[in-house]
């Protein structure tokens, strides 16, 4: 196939799958890569929503056994109920603020310079928190108290600022309240399922009519690319952070945000 947009759709799908669950901001990466590629065949918001669904499907597949077990055992197992309760409680703060300030976020905060500043600031925060060498006390989501979940949920509110990174804010909050690195990463994955599914349903409800039959092969290519790349990245991330931590992602954010800032300054 000689259609350059088909290749661009695959590239953007890979970018989404790689960056969605790393604490590096998928928004910032999709903005810059989409602009560099000049990808405009599919309405941007529609395409972004669909490839996010591909990334979420990867989490559901990878953790299908654990998620099924939690749902099955919830009536009789306290740990399973803790798991479900922690997800629900952590969703509340950002969910409320997101509804209240949705228009403000889109109209005021969704600018290249805000994204750059959020990338750099978030990177500095990750490096600083890792250098604190905090002693982890919580080693599984099933052991979360509702207070722990609420504190992490409050941190997730920061991710309403474009460029902060939903997974980055969740992981930072988890580390600060004593969650071990692997569990912090996994909680960010589990929390992403209802967050991104809900956001996708709302977005598709408002934009599905923009999809044409000519776009379907591009949407499918991006979806599959996001699914496969997310599968690989999530498996690697859990192993990597257990022994290396998140510092490298902090430095990457600082570098990427600085380069983006230079790029947008020169292009304007």
Curated annotation (Swiss-Prot):
GO function terms (MF aspect): undecaprenyl-diphosphatase activity
Cited InterPro entries: UppP (IPR003824)
Biological function: Catalyzes the dephosphorylation of undecaprenyl diphosphate (UPP). Confers resistance to bacitracin.
GO annotation, biological process: cell wall organization; peptidoglycan biosynthetic process; regulation of cell shape; response to antibiotic
NCBIfam families, per database record: PRK00281.1-2, PRK00281.1-4, undec_PP_bacA
Reactions accelerated catalytically: di-trans,octa-cis-undecaprenyl diphosphate + H2O = di-trans,octa-cis-undecaprenyl phosphate + phosphate + H(+)
Protein name in UniProt: Undecaprenyl-diphosphatase
PANTHER family noted in UniProt: UNDECAPRENYL-DIPHOSPHATASE
Subcellular location field: Cell inner membrane
Note: Bacitracin is thought to be involved in the inhibition of peptidoglycan synthesis by sequestering undecaprenyl diphosphate, thereby reducing the pool of lipid carrier available.
Keyword annotations: Antibiotic resistance, Cell inner membrane, Cell membrane, Cell shape, Cell wall biogenesis/degradation, Hydrolase, Membrane, Peptidoglycan synthesis, Transmembrane, Transmembrane helix
EC number of this enzyme: 3.6.1.27
Key word Cell membrane present: yes
Source organism (scientific name): Parvibaculum lavamentivorans (strain DS-1 / DSM 13023 / NCIMB 13966)
Enzyme class, first EC level, given as a word: hydrolase
Record's keyword annotation contains Heme: no
Disulfide pairings: none
An example Gene Ontology CC term for this record: plasma membrane
Transmembrane segments: 42-62, 86-106, 108-128, 158-178, 184-204, 218-238, 246-266
Membrane topology: Multi-pass membrane protein
Gene (UniProt): uppP
Family: Belongs to the UppP family.
């Amino acid at each position: 196939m000689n259609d350059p947009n088909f290749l661009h759709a695959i590239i953007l799908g890979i970018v989404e799958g790689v960056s969605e669950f790393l604490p590096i901001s998928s928004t910032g990466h999709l903005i810059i890569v989409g602009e560099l590629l000049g990808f405009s065949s599919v309405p941007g918001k529609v395409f972004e929503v669909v490839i996010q669904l591909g990334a979420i499907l990867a989490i559901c597949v990878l953790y299908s056994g654990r998620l099924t077990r939690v749902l099955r055992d919830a009536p009789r197992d306290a740990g399973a109920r803790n798991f479900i309760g922690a997800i629900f409680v952590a969703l509340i703060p950002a969910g409320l603020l997101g509804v209240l300030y949705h228009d403000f976020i889109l109209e005021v905060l969704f600018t290249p310079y805000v994204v750059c500043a959020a990338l750099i600031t978030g990177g500095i925060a990750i490096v600083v928190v890792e250098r604190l060498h905090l002693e982890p006390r919580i080693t599984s989501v099933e052991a979360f108290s509702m207070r722990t979940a609420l504190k992490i949920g409050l941190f997730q509110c920061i991710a309403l600022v474009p460029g902060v990174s939903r997974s980055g804010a969740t992981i930072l909050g988890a580390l600060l309240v004593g969650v071990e690195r692997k569990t912090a990463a996994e909680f960010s994955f589990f929390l992403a399922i209802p967050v991104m599914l809900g956001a996708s349903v709302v977005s598709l409800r408002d934009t599905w009519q923009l999809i044409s039959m000519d776009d379907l092969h591009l949407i499918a290519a991006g979806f599959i690319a996001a699914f496969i790349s997310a599968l690989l990245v999530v498996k690697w991330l859990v192993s990597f952070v257990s022994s290396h931590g998140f510092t490298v992602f902090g430095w990457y954010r600082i570098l990427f945000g600085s380069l983006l800032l230079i790029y947008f300054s020169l292009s304007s």
